[in-house]
Amino acid sequence: RQRQMCIRDRGGRYPYVYVDGIYLRRNWGGEFENVAILVAIAVNEDGYREVLGAAEGMKEDKASWVSFFQWLRGRGLDGVKLIVGDKCLGMLEAVGEVFPEAKYQRCTVHFYRNVFSVTPRSKVKLVAKMLKAIHAQESKKAAREKAKAVVEELRAMKLKEAAKKVEDGIEETLTYCDFPSEHWTRIRTNNVIERLNREIRRRTRVVGSFPDGNSALMLVCARLRHVAGTQWGNKKYMNMKHLEATLEDTSIAG
């Protein structure tokens, strides 16, 4: 059974939701193993960041994500327009199952790392520049055209595996283009949650390993609560009027 902890007790409308899994070491009967703590944060209708909750998922698979999303929805999470995260096993299917009205944005940073995994080290800087050029375009149409050119260029460089990863995965990294351009840099990656995870890892390194998943979850939630009470949660993250205008334009066009 998945254990969950809520950082906030009331529901609300959160247009942008960021999700990620952080792996911590658990000492289980003298044997060490990794346990995934699933974390969700969101930007509310007023443009402020909030930590929604965390859960122990034995592994980042579809069942864990579905359970986590259903729990969040059951606690009142509503109005979700976009979910940002890495393309881990089952994530996309879980989003479609629990939040069918929401779109999915694959984190571009994780996408780049995935392409780099099949790129010779000597070519990584060049390939990074090529990939960033795709996401620097001013429209989805232009980004798609640039991506096609990059794929051809990678093939010409004899980087067939990298070319295939770009060709197969680029579309799910361009969902942000359907939202206000003023928000693009903050909704195409889940860097906002990665920074929280780095803070958690710093704290957990002191502890070392945990006797069970629940103690790991409790420490993670304690750190998340702490961060949520700082300037991180008290400073406006984005102007949501841009989203309202975009949604109005879309409904008129529809």
Indicate residue ranges for each PLM-predicted region:
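Two-metal-ion RNase H-like nuclease active-site motif
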Residues: G12-G29, V39-I41
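Conserved nucleotide-binding/hydrolysis micro-motifs of P-loop NTPases
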Residues: Y23-R25, E45, M58-E60, C88-G90, ...
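Active-site beta-loop-alpha junctions of metal-dependent nucleic acid enzymes
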Residues: A54-G76
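Acidic/histidine-rich catalytic cores and adjacent linkers
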Residues: A133-G254
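Short, small-residue-biased leader/transition segments that mark boundaries at the very start
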Residues: Q2-I7
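Conserved beta-strand -> loop -> alpha-helix junction used to position metal-binding or nucleic-acid-contacting
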Residues: L82-L89, A94-M130
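Short, flexible loop/turn motifs enriched in small residues
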Residues: G30-I37, E45-G47
